[in-house]
């Protein structure tokens, strides 16, 4: 399959998923709370792509949720290109993806994160994953979440779940705190074996996130919470901020490739405490 077609298929999927997720989130919130939509361009003078980020705040269910789509292209800086595969002969790149972060009003509902992307240099690969960060311990929820992820992974390859769970546990870890960010999930990168199969898996991950996040909200949002619970949530969000600013690859990639700063930092919660 031609790389142009692969790019178009991947980009269209990410954009469609953004539309679907935002529509469902607004339906949950009701008529009063809507996404604020911002379009952006990577360059003011050259055609280097851009994207659209959507942020909804102060809802009855969501304190803040961001859903970002991007398609950017151009050249890596000499400093950054050495960190990216496929750039020995050329610094040109193309990248598209979707990123979602949900910070909930009810402290019993965990923060949820998902992203998938397709990056092309001299060759193309997929990356992404999803994870959940509760501020209240709930072993039943944790077991259910991982069983759902395993089911999704097993549809494509029986080895995926164990491997991608391990990568997620290793990735979402704060070494300076010596603690994990949350209860894990799956995380994968440099996926470039069979394009059709890889793209099918990437779509599966997106659909799974939609279904899992809906189910978690349905289960947990009914629970009553206190001011003390909210304070616990604020402190847990502090850990979220630390990880995203110090260790997150997506944040570093976006900032070092001229991405939109507001879109990149949309993952940060509206309020956090230390």
Predicted stretch roles:
Residues 2-85, 191-246:
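Gly/Pro-rich turn-and-neighbor structural signature
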Residues 6, 104-106, 122, 132-139, ...:
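A generic structural motif
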Residues 51-128:
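Internal mixed beta-strand/loop scaffold within catalytic domains of large alpha/beta enzymes
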Residues 64, 94-96, 125-133, 179-193, ...:
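Glycine-rich, often proline-containing surface loops adjacent to acidic residues and nearby aromatics
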Residues 78-80, 109-111, 138-141, 253-255:
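Short helix/loop capping segments that flank catalytic or ligand/cofactor-binding pockets
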Residues 104, 251-274:
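Long, contiguous binding/interaction regions
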Residues 122-166:
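Compact, glycine/acidic-enriched structural inserts
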Residues 151-201, 216-218:
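Long, charged, mostly alpha-helical binding arms that flank functional sites
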């Amino acid at each position: 399959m031609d790389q142009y077609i692969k790019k178009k298929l991947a980009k269209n999927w990410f954009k469609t998923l953004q539309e679907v997720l935002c529509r469902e989130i607004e339906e949950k919130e009701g008529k009063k709370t809507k996404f604020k939509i911002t379009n952006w361009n990577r360059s003011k003078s050259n055609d280097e792509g851009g994207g659209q980020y959507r942020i909804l705040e102060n809802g009855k269910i969501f304190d803040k949720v961001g859903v970002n789509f991007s398609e950017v292209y151009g050249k890596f800086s000499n400093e950054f290109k050495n960190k990216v595969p496929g750039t020995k002969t050329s610094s040109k790149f193309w990248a598209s993806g979707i990123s979602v972060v949900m910070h909930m009003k009810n402290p019993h509902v965990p923060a949820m994160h998902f992203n998938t992307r397709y990056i092309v240099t001299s060759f193309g690969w997929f990356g992404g994953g999803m994870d959940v960060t509760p501020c209240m311990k709930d072993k039943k929820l944790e077991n259910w979440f991982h069983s759902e992820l395993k089911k999704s992974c097993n549809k494509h390859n029986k080895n995926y779940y164990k491997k991608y769970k391990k990568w997620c546990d290793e990735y979402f870890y704060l070494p300076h705190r010596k603690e994990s960010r949350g209860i894990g999930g799956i995380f994968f990168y440099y996926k470039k074996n069979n394009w059709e199969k890889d793209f099918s898996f990437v779509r599966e991950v997106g659909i799974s996130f939609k279904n899992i996040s809906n189910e978690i909200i349905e289960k947990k949002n009914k629970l009553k919470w206190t001011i003390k619970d909210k304070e616990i949530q604020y402190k847990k969000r502090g850990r979220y901020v630390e990880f995203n600013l110090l260790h997150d690859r997506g944040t570093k990639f976006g900032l070092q490739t001229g991405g939109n700063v507001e879109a990149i930092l949309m993952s940060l919660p509206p309020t956090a405490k230390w």
